[in-house]
Every structure is written in C-alpha cells, then in structure tokens.
C-alpha cells in the first residue's frame, strides 16, 4: 500500500514535533480518518496542541489501538523491533514513519542526505546554495522543520536530512539525488551491528535517480547497481585538484573555487561542500550561482561554533558531536596556539571510545570527562579529569586558562543523561563560555 486507500483508523506512536506534524498532515487528508496517539510519557510534549477529536493515550502503550489500526505511524525514536509493535506486525498492519507519509504527498523534486556525520551541515548548506540560485527551497527532516510541515511551503525543491531511524520506516521516497556521506559506529544500542546500521542507511538509495557516494568510504556504496557520482579529496567526479600550489574544489578536474575561500573551516568541510555541489548539479542547478554561498556560509549552531573569544581564549561549541567520529573530525581540523581543554562525556550509546586515543596523544590538551559515561574516557589519556557535570568541568578548568588556549565541548556522546537534547547542552556550554569570558 502506498497511500490512504482503505485506511480509516490511524495510530500515531510518539508525539513531540514529529508526531504533531503527522497529526496535522492526517487531518488535512480528504479521507475521513480516525486518529489516535500513543505516547509512553505521562505528559508528552505537544499534548496540549492536539485537537479534541484526536484521542491521546499517555504513560504507556495501548495494544487494543495498535492491533485494530489500519495504519501505524511511528516516531523515529521507536524501533520496529520494539516488542510492543510485534502483535501489529504479526497481524500484517502497515507501519510507516513521517518520511513515508511525505513520500506519498510530495509533488516536487526531493534530494536527501544521510551519513553518520556531517549530514546537518550538508543539508543546510545545500538548501542555502539552492536558495541563492533562485530556487524556492524547503529544508528539514531530521533538522529544523519536520518534513510534513515543509509541504505547507509549496516549494520547488525539498532538501531533507534523513537519519537511519527515519529510513527504517521509509519505502517509497523517490529522490532526484541522494548522498550517503560516511559510515562510522553510532547507535549500537539500536542496531545489531555495523552491517545492520549500514543497511538502514542504504535505504536512501532505493528510489534515487543519482546516488552520491564517498570515494574514501566504500561502505557508502550501494550493494546493487545504481547511477553513481562520487566525492573525495582526490580527483574524480567531485574532488580536489592543485594548481600553482593552491588546492581547489573541482568537478571533473575543472576548478570551481579555492579551498581557502570556503567560509567553513576544516578538511571535513571541503568534503561537505563537494557533496552540496554534487547534489545541486544532479538536479540541474547552475553551480555558478551557488559558489558565493560557499564563500560566506559559516555553518550551523552547535557544530564547531566559536561562541566566545576573549583575551586570546576561544570557546568552541561542538555539542552536535554525539559520536566518536564527529569528535575525531573536530580534532583533526584544529589550529591550536596553546592548550586544548576538551570536554567529553554523556551517554555513549555503546560506542568504543578507544578510537580517540591516537588523536588525543598528538595534542597539547587536558580532557575533562563528565556525565553518565564520562568514566570511560579517563583511561584513554593520563591527562584526564573526571567531573560530575559540565558546569563542574568548566569551573575546574577556568583558573588554568592562558592566552592561546581553546575550550571545546565535543562530547562524542548523546546528551540525554543531563540535558533534553544536544542543543540544550550546547546552549548551556555557550552560557558558561560567555559567563567565564566576561570574568577573565
């Protein structure tokens, strides 16, 4: 089934921003649908925004609703392997996510991005470049606006960030172009292993006209024959060339702009810029109209963002680094004059933090480890200190700061042990940075 034909009873599992967008979308359908919402939280966010004709069951599951539904729409945070969904699956009830509903409804070109790291930056950058070329563009999915809310914008192009969780429940999304940026260990508390995680990511290519893959990460290549374009740091479809000692971003070995002109810093952002170029090229957007955006784009909040710079001490908010690979990328691009004071920790999601050791060894640093899994970092480097909270860590490091030092939050962990999300964690760090910068 692809659509609402024959559907009368719909159960939405999980409220919040995504769940509310699903409810609003269902209410807009011409079919007379009975909509019910299940949320295991006692007071789920958005409960007060539900219309009276949408019944809510909170504080647990409601099996009768699930097994009598014609269609179940789950929040990305709900795994299909959840035992509470098994009776409905055994009964043959279709379970989809919000992106599948988006696929049924969208009537303009869509491009999408997935990967373990960098997908938010690539999604936002691609959207900004398309807008600069005069294309009415809507950006969202796993970033910013929920995908279904974007449909109200009547865009000419949709640019979506898609997580592996969203892709699990997406089957019919047709894409003009799709990019799989990279694959590194993440969400091992959800998946049986890396192969399982990779298969979820690869679903982005199922109905893509052009598949954009990473030449430096063969795990991003589809297992079946597809139309491929690749990006990387060598020459290729989209890559880098050197002329007169200057590195350039290039398409088919033809230079587009110098790497040192990019508004974003760090080697990983050269790759991110190449992906954005490849995606827009795939949908026929004139690249000349987009290159100025690459020169001026400074990135997203909570991603290697300098939030304070006072007395020669920089405070960098990289709260979006919720896994080891993200923190490694942040460390690889650093320009340090003094010592790095690195804040790590939170919920490790079963990750192997030992991959950080070589990068830490090469840096002049002190590492402050906090949160639920902070103790797992201490053994990585003798220059480590265990703290209960980020506040305690900053209070401890502050008296030791000298001109040229950098304080960086790049936790390599999820935030939900002490914060609502990575944004709240980043905001808390930013507040601390500004507070201590004033005092210094």
UniProtKB/Swiss-Prot annotation:
GO terms for molecular function: ATP binding; UDP-N-acetylmuramoylalanine-D-glutamate ligase activity. It catalyses: UDP-N-acetyl-alpha-D-muramoyl-L-alanine + D-glutamate + ATP = UDP-N-acetyl-alpha-D-muramoyl-L-alanyl-D-glutamate + ADP + phosphate + H(+). Its main location: cytoplasm. Transmembrane segments: none annotated. It comes from Aliivibrio fischeri (strain MJ11) (Vibrio fischeri). GO terms for biological process: cell division; cell wall organization; peptidoglycan biosynthetic process; regulation of cell shape. Its EC number is 6.3.2.9. Belongs to the MurCDEF family. Pathway: Cell wall biogenesis; peptidoglycan biosynthesis. Cell wall formation. Catalyzes the addition of glutamate to the nucleotide precursor UDP-N-acetylmuramoyl-L-alanine (UMA). Keywords: ATP-binding, Cell cycle, Cell division, Cell shape, Cell wall biogenesis/degradation, Cytoplasm, Ligase, Nucleotide-binding, Peptidoglycan synthesis. NCBIfam families: murD. ATP binds at residues 115-121. This is UDP-N-acetylmuramoylalanine--D-glutamate ligase. The keyword Nucleus does not apply. GO terms for cellular component: cytoplasm. It is found in: Cytoplasm. The keyword Disulfide bond does not apply.
């Amino acid at each position: 089934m692809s659509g609402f034909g024959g559907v009368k009873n719909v159960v939405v599992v999980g409220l919040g921003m995504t769940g509310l967008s699903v409810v609003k979308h269902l209410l807009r359908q011409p079919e007379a649908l009975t909509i019910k919402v299940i949320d295991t939280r006692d007071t789920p966010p958005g409960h007060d925004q539900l219309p009276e004709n949408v019944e809510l069951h909170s504080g647990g599951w409601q099996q009768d609703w699930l097994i009598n539904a014609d269609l179940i729409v789950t929040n990305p945070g709900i795994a299909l392997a959840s035992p509470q969904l098994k009776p409905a699956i055994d009964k043959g009830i279709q379970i989809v996510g919000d992106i599948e509903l988006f696929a049924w409804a969208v009537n303009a070109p869509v491009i999408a991005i997935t990967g373990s790291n960098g997908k938010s930056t690539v999604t936002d950058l691609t959207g900004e470049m398309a807008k600069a070329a005069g294309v009415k563009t809507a950006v969202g999915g796993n970033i910013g606006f929920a995908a279904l809310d974007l449909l109200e914008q009547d865009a000419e192009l949709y640019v979506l960030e898609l997580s592996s969780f969203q892709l699990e429940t997406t089957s019919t999304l047709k894409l003009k172009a799709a990019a799989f940026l990279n694959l590194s260990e993440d969400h091992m508390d959800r998946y049986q292993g890396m192969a399982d995680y990779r298969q979820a990511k690869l679903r982005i290519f199922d109905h893509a006209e052009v598949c954009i893959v990473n030449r430096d990460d063969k795990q991003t290549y589809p297992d079946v024959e597809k139309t491929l374009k690749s990006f990387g740091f060598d020459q290729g479809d989209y890559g880098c060339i050197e002329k007169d000692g200057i590195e350039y971003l290039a398409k088919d070995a033809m230079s587009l702009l110098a790497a040192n002109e990019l508004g974003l810093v760090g080697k990983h952002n050269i790759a991110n810029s190449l992906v954005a170029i490849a995606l827009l090229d795939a949908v026929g957007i004139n690249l000349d109209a987009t290159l100025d955006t690459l020169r001026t784009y400074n990135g997203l909040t909570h991603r290697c963002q300098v939030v304070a710079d006072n007395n020669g001490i920089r405070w960098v908010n990289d709260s979006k680094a919720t896994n080891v690979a993200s923190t490694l990328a942040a460390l690889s691009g650093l320009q340090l004059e003094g010592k790095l004071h690195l804040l790590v920790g939170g919920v490790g999601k079963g990750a192997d933090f030992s991959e950080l050791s070589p990068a830490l060894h090469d840096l002049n640093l002190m590492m402050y480890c906090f949160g639920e899994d902070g103790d797992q970092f201490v053994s990585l480097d003798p220059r480590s200190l265990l703290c209960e909270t980020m506040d305690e860590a900053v209070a401890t490091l502050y008296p030791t700061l000298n001109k040229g030092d950098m304080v960086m939050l790049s936790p390599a962990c999820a935030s939900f042990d002490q914060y609502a999300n990575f944004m709240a964690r980043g905001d808390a760090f930013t507040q601390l940075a500004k507070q201590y910068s004033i005092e210094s």
